[in-house]
Regions:
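Low-complexity, glycine/serine/threonine/alanine-rich intrinsically disordered linker
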Residues: 1-680
Length: 680
């Protein structure tokens, strides 16, 4: 329901800052629509929902009258044909003909209800080891084949190849089995979506494969009959039928769901309790609105707070609106009221539910659970804050804290907004965007769980990689799609500054800029935001001929008096990372083959000759990093910028980090126990 909401305003990367939250008429329209949709989905009067089964065997493509009215995804196209075998092979990449739709659910407009569905696919990986060499591009010989299950919405925009504008990746698995095997997942799908099987790491688009195989692999006997044949369906089908390279072979797809654990659901009970539509009247509706508001507001409604909504519902009932519709309207109004939309904790010392809410939204990004509310009601939350922090960080819901904080601190949500050019093929082929984010989040999670000191973010000699990310980093011996701890000893990487997400978020997707990366390091690791450049100073234009290096351009730029001081602080930090390209790959030269100079001198006089030495210089400024990290965490926890009055608490917490045994979990606990956190 909230997918069309405009993005929140970010202040220094954080979108939970109250000062930046502005409610517009357009946003209120979205709130009303989302509330109406949420109530519609939660309403479950009537008989228990029955799980349904759907199945489709090969062929997954059709021709002639069988294909009439179907989108091209299901039709035999230029390089698709109805197989004579009991299976269908996928040859190409997922985005160009390398996917299989699911006709039974397409015909009825997707799954009927949102919920958990079981998806089963009978498939195999065929031809992983081949002798086609570079004809298959960068596909690595012997690699597992990656099968992806996606949820797609074909009710909107659909391209000629069957691609859709709304696609959600649900699961991926690596296949090495050459004999058919069933694979099963339980996944959540929204109503109207349907599943799709994709060949995620297919070597080439099918159309291109026919051309490449009959030129670059023309010596292979299986392709000789087609070398001189005119391009067309016969040639395309013949080449692909003779092809012996990597193929994702699919026999059957089954879908079952939605699986209903409780009927009616918790959402339905929150709205209606145990009442049926016939039991709704002015009195029961009033009681339900009171009960629903207490859950929605995360506290009992203030005196008179519900009067406008109760009055609205009463008037609508008098006008003849049916009781069920009147209750829905009242609940919709509650979900669009300030009590629900804003986390209003009051002023002064936080107690009870207010303190429980701040703690829960900090560590779980959700309302307080029954344990917190029970302690709050009994007046026992304050003396038990330490124990609750430990309990909450051990709960899987704390993954939200890790994900939300890390992405806002390091601007990781920006990855993908300026995707790299097609020159960085591996970024798309190996799904590096997802792996990079996961690496940094898992790294943060490890530091938190192990209660390691913040210094770990600066010079840790390990990270969490899968095969694709390790190959991107030039590290051998890592197998599998799952991220695992990997030693970085002997490499140029270590700490945050060697991670792909950090390096990609500080670039623009096309090239690197020492100025942009330098500012990023200053803001994210050292806690200093340089002033904006003077309006009369021209921007640095890259020399696309490659005749002048960026260092030479910046030396010239620093001759401008108004620029010199800031660039003295910024440029060395960016040049230290110049050996990393726009997606974090290692390079020794620029595109014009000019050698990269990653040396530098910091304002304090310390010098470095490489990124490894720069990492040591950062460790020497560990106190500055500790203060920066503490300030970022407090800003996220409080939902506001720190003020002058917060400095004593910031100083006291940061001072604790000078002890080598103080870890990240200790830091989070110290923030929660601080007067600043417990006061609004």
């Amino acid at each position: 329901p909230a997918e069309d909401f405009p993005e929140e305003v970010k202040i220094h990367g954080f979108d939970n800052n109250g000062a930046g939250l502005v409610t517009s008429g357009r946003l209120m329209d979205h709130y009303f629509s989302a509330a109406e949709e949420a109530i519609r989905r939660a309403t479950q009067f009537g008989a228990r929902s029955v799980s349904k089964k759907y199945a489709q065997r090969t062929p997954f493509y059709f021709r002639g009258n069988d294909a009439k009215g179907l989108p091209k995804l299901f039709q035999t196209g230029r390089f698709r044909f109805v197989p004579e075998t009991p299976y269908t092979d996928l040859y190409g990449r997922h985005y160009r003909g390398g996917h299989i739709g699911f006709l039974p659910l397409y015909r009825q407009g997707g799954v009927p209800r949102s919920g958990i569905y079981t998806i089963r696919v009978r498939a195999a990986a065929v031809g992983r080891v081949h002798d086609y060499g570079k004809a298959l591009g960068d596909f690595r010989n012997g690699d597992p084949l990656v099968m992806e299950i996606a949820a797609v919405d074909r009710r909107g925009s659909v391209t000629s190849t069957g691609n859709v504008s709304k696609m959600i990746s649900l699961a991926r698995i690596e296949l090495t089995n050459e004999e058919p095997k069933w694979f099963e997942w339980q996944v959540y799908m929204e109503a109207g979506y349907e599943p799709e099987v994709r060949f995620r790491n297919g070597p080439l688009a099918a159309k291109r494969m026919v051309r490449v195989l009959t030129t670059q692999a023309a010596e292979k006997p299986e392709f000789k009959p087609f070398i001189n044949m005119k391009p067309g369906l016969e040639k395309g089908h013949g080449v692909l039928k003779a092809y012996k390279g990597p193929r994702l072979r699919v026999w059957e797809i089954k879908v079952e769901g939605p699986h209903v654990e409780a009927w009616p659901s918790a959402g339905h009970r929150a709205l209606y309790g145990d009442l049926t539509p016939s039991q709704l009247n002015a009195k029961t509706i009033s009681r339900r609105l009171e009960a629903f508001a207490e859950q929605a507001f995360r506290r009992p409604p203030h005196k008179g707070e519900l009067e406008p909504i109760q009055r609205l519902v009463t008037n609508k009932l008098r006008e003849g609106l049916k009781p069920l519709r009147a209750l829905k309207l009242g609940c919709q109004a509650i979900l669009c009221s300030p009590g629900f939309l804003y986390l209003n904790l009051g002023e002064g010392e936080l107690r009870g539910v207010a303190l429980a809410s701040r703690l829960s939204y900090f560590l779980w990004s959700s309302p307080p659970d029954a344990t917190l509310l029970k302690l709050a009601a009994a007046g026992k939350l304050r003396p038990n804050l330490s124990a609750q922090v430990k309990r909450m960080l051990a709960d899987p819901k704390s993954d939200r804290f890790v994900r939300h904080f890390v992405r806002r601190w390091l601007d990781l949500d920006n990855i993908g907004t300026m995707p790299p050019s097609a020159d960085f093929l591996e970024y798309y082929r190996d799904n590096l965007e997802t792996a990079m984010r996961a690496e940094t989040e898992m790294f943060f999670r490890n530091v938190l769980d192990q209660n390691l000191p913040p210094r770990e973010f600066l010079d840790a000699d390990y990270s969490f990689l899968n095969r694709e990310l390790a190959l991107h980093y030039g590290i051998k011996g890592v197998e599998g799609n799952a991220l695992k701890r990997v030693s970085l000893k002997g490499s140029n990487r270590g700490g945050l500054i060697g991670q792909g997400a950090f390096l990609t978020a500080s670039a623009n997707g096309v090239d690197t800029s020492p100025v942009v990366r330098g500012i990023y390091v200053l803001e994210k690791l050292l806690g200093y935001t340089p002033p904006s450049p003077p309006p009369d100073v021209p921007a640095i234009e890259p020399d696309i001929r490659g005749a002048v290096t960026i260092r030479e351009q910046l030396i010239k730029h620093r001759e401008i008096a108004t620029c010199a001081e800031c660039h003295r602080k910024i440029d060395p930090l960016g040049f230290a990372l110049e050996n990393f390209d726009a997606i974090g790959g290692w390079r020794e030269t620029y595109e014009a083959k000019q050698p990269i100079d990653a040396t530098g001198k910091l304002p304090g006089g310390a010098t470095f000759k490489s990124v490894s030495e720069f990492r040591k210089r950062l460790v020497e400024r560990q106190d500055q990093f500790n203060r920066c990290l503490t300030e970022k965490l407090m800003t996220y926890a409080l939902g506001r910028e720190l003020e002058i009055g917060d400095r004593p608490q910031l100083d006291a917490i940061t001072a604790r980090l000078k002890h080598s045994k103080t870890g990240l979990r200790d830091l989070v606990e110290a923030i929660v126990l601080s007067e600043t956190f417990r006061t609004n």
